[in-house]
Design a protein with these regions (language model features):
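Flexible, active-site-adjacent loop/turn segments at secondary-structure boundaries
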Residues: 114, 120, 124-127, 133, ...
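Short amphipathic alpha-helical segments and helix-helix/interface helices
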Residues: 135-136, 159, 185-186, 209-210, ...
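A conditional alpha-helix N-cap/helix-loop micro-motif detector
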Residues: 125-128, 152, 178, 199-203, ...
């Protein structure tokens, strides 16, 4: 689920000296939008290969292509390095090592997603689950449940995991870049009983989300790459960072339970970790500053998970205010 559709600069080779960056300086010519390769045509091709090729073969091909991509477009690779630097104390060599792992991990993540959306059996993809008691307690409360997650691991797999346990999940997404990709991915989720709530086309979409949460539904929201209209400044790894204030806005509107969650790949399977709910005093959320503080608390709750799995924190556009 790519939550930052915008004009891409990919395709213009970044000058070699732009790949030399330090945490205190702004590198030149970093790509600000999603890759031109991320579109319906490539996604359909990936779904086709997922049906035709063995998993291991497809993952080997995907890994080779992703590593080639990182070489051909050094600006994209440098973007990831810059995103990782604050989490490793500004150590360039460590950030580059994490970045190399991240590109390899991303290729496997995408193949897993293609296989899922192609309708292939994925029963053996899930591993450890922690914090399930937090989710069950939230369900018993009768309030809506908002699952808040970063772009970490394979966040899309939270929906089929809950479906396996008899729970329905509504997934919030922005319109995907290009023509037809939103509908393609929406249809794939629908075949698995997962409903997609697309923000950006229908001005009443946010009202529909509020209505569902008020009715006790479970909704998933990505917090760490918001559109400008819902971005608020918080701190992550000691840096200024834009996070989505939408979770706090929905808490104010519906009194929903906020559950931070993340799904990293560990030992060949995806673990699901549900953290304790982030508590709040609803009347105070009338103040925007209080909503910003609540957003900060949600981000802070997820920060240790991101730090522990940096090689699976998938951001290919700049995430820091200084960039």
């Amino acid at each position: 689920m790519n939550l930052e559709p915008s004009t891409s600069t990919l395709g213009t080779r970044t000058p070699p000296d732009a790949a030399v960056g330090v945490p205190s300086s702004k590198p030149r010519a970093l790509p600000q939008g999603p890759s031109l390769f991320y579109g319906a045509a490539l996604w359909r091709l990936g779904l086709l290969f997922a049906r035709l090729l063995p998993e291991r073969a497809l993952k080997s091909i995907a890994a080779a292509l992703v590593l080639l991509y990182a070489r051909v477009f050094p600006g994209r690779r440098e973007t990831v390095v810059q995103n990782i630097l604050p989490a490793v104390g500004g150590h360039r060599a460590r950030a580059e090592a994490v970045t190399a792992k991240l590109f390899r991990q991303f290729s496997g993540k995408v193949v897993d997603l293609w296989r899922f959306e192609a309708g292939l059996p994925m029963d053996d993809i899930f591993g450890e689950m922690t914090g399930w008691d937090h989710f069950l307690a939230a369900q018993k409360s009768g309030r809506g449940v908002l699952l808040v997650t970063p772009h970490l691991g394979n966040w899309e797999f939270g929906a089929p995991l809950l479906t396996r346990h008899g729970f329905k999940l509504n997934v919030i997404t922005l319109v995907e870049p290009g023509h037809g990709l939103t509908e393609l991915r929406q249809a794939a989720r629908a075949r698995c009983g997962i409903e997609t709530l697309v923000i950006g086309r229908d001005p009443f979409a946010f009202v529909e989300i509020i209505r569902r949460l008020e009715a006790g539904a479970t909704v998933a929201l990505l917090i760490d790459r918001p559109p400008k209209t819902s971005a608020v400044e918080v701190e992550l790894f000691g840096e200024k960072f834009s996070a989505s204030i939408a979770a706090a806005e929905l808490a104010r509107a519906t009194n929903c339970i906020l559950l931070p969650v993340y799904l990293p790949r560990i030992g060949g399977k995806y673990a699901a970790h549900i953290l304790p709910p982030v508590e709040y005093d609803r009347p105070t959320l009338r103040d925007r500053a209080a909503r910003q503080q609540l957003t900060q608390r949600v981000v802070s709750a997820l920060e240790p998970a991101v730090r522990a799995h940096l090689e699976q924190w998938y951001h290919f556009v700049p995430v820091w205010k200084r960039l």
